[in-house]
Amino acid sequence: MIVALKGNIEKKEPTRLWLEVGGVTYEIFISIHTSAALGEKEARLLITHLIREEAWSLYGFAEEAEKRVFDTLIKINGVGPKAALAILSTYTPPTFAQIIQAQDVKALQRVPGIGPKSAGRIMVELAGFSLSLQEGSKASTPPVFEESRLALESLGFKSELIAKALQNIQATTTQEIIKEALKKLQTLR
């Protein structure tokens, strides 16, 4: 099984990449977030290799968290790799985890190709889903979104409102996330 590939980028589209590795060019399907994170010449991607009757496909990820969400989603009956990539192109892994924890079905339905039935099934199947990486992870502190969520809870905000406020925030530090979330929370009350 292929776990990762490193090579030269021959062609890059928003959701697809041609990667030349040792004289062989691979077509790898990627999310929009992974595409944005990649350079123009070289890339190293974590790979999920799916073997189906009709095709052998490679799906690439710039981060382990994105790969973990993808691998979890494709195990759900009725959610295929295209739907999983659509979710990951719409939401970052921390935002997706917040949506699942808040049971925000409407946010999930904003993903192209995800209707009420699929959104409900995903919510049921992923109840209790956590983005924390398995043992051996270098991260010893919780993700910045988890820190922000806890800080907002300590200020007395309800978890449902916090989850809505944290959606689509692109900030990368706890302080920036909390600032943006507080602005959103003022309009949500």
Curated annotation (Swiss-Prot):
SUPFAM superfamilies: DNA helicase RuvA subunit, C-terminal domain (SSF46929), Nucleic acid-binding proteins (SSF50249), RuvA domain 2-like (SSF47781). The RuvA-RuvB-RuvC complex processes Holliday junction (HJ) DNA during genetic recombination and DNA repair, while the RuvA-RuvB complex plays an important role in the rescue of blocked DNA replication forks via replication fork reversal (RFR). RuvA specifically binds to HJ cruciform DNA, conferring on it an open structure. The RuvB hexamer acts as an ATP-dependent pump, pulling dsDNA into and through the RuvAB complex. HJ branch migration allows RuvC to scan DNA until it finds its consensus sequence, where it cleaves and resolves the cruciform DNA. It is found in: Cytoplasm. Homotetramer. Forms an RuvA(8)-RuvB(12)-Holliday junction (HJ) complex. HJ DNA is sandwiched between 2 RuvA tetramers; dsDNA enters through RuvA and exits via RuvB. An RuvB hexamer assembles on each DNA strand where it exits the tetramer. Each RuvB hexamer is contacted by two RuvA subunits (via domain III) on 2 adjacent RuvB subunits; this complex drives branch migration. In the full resolvosome a probable DNA-RuvA(4)-RuvB(12)-RuvC(2) complex forms which resolves the HJ. Keywords: Cytoplasm, DNA damage, DNA recombination, DNA repair, DNA-binding. One of its GO terms (molecular function) is four-way junction DNA binding. Residues 1-62 are annotated as: Domain I. Residues 140-189 are annotated as: Domain III. SMART domains: HhH1. The keyword DNA damage applies. It comes from the Bacteria. Belongs to the RuvA family. Residues 138-139 are annotated as: Flexible linker. GO terms for biological process: DNA recombination; DNA repair. Residues 63-138 are annotated as: Domain II. This is Holliday junction branch migration complex subunit RuvA.
